[in-house]
């Protein structure tokens, strides 16, 4: 239950994050979701396909909040729920990765103000929700 509540809080704060990045990350400036040259496909369309970065962010937050608001397998505590949390964290991480690699000033400004990314990474590492092999943003002093 504790992990579930932290995930919900992160999503709430990420909603504000996405609303703010939308000023510089638009469908015109970032027509596809990518980070560090790696494209990411949006699963919100039935079959995964390319989507603008801001569209991907909105779709991912919507997907995650919907799943957190519905009944998670095992009441949010078993292996099935762990797989859902891992999938959610992997997709949410991509939003931060896009901001870091394509909107660095925004990323740094937001991180200095809220520490949201650091909290996100610490939560993911503590509960084995983010495989180290998929973390493409270099460790920051607040995430190491």
Annotate each PLM feature.
Residues 78-120:
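Conserved, folded interaction/cargo-binding domains in eukaryotic regulatory proteins
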Residues 110-144:
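Eukaryote-biased recognition of C-terminal alpha-helical segments
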Residues 1-77, 127, 131-138:
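Extended alpha-helical interaction segments
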């Amino acid at each position: 239950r504790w992990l579930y509540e932290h995930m919900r809080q992160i999503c709430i704060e990420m909603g504000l994050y996405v609303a703010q990045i939308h000023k510089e990350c638009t469908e015109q400036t970032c027509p596809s979701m990518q980070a560090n040259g790696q494209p990411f496909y949006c699963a919100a369309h039935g079959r995964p396909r390319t989507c603008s970065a801001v569209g991907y962010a909105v779709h991912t937050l919507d997907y995650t909040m919907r799943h957190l608001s519905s009944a998670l397998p095992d009441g949010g505590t078993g292996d099935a729920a762990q797989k859902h949390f891992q999938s959610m964290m992997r997709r949410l991480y991509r939003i931060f990765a896009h901001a870091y690699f394509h909107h660095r000033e925004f990323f740094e400004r937001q991180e200095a103000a809220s520490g949201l990314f650091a909290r996100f990474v610490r939560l993911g590492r503590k509960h084995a929700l983010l495989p180290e092999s998929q973390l493409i943003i270099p460790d920051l002093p607040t995430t190491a």
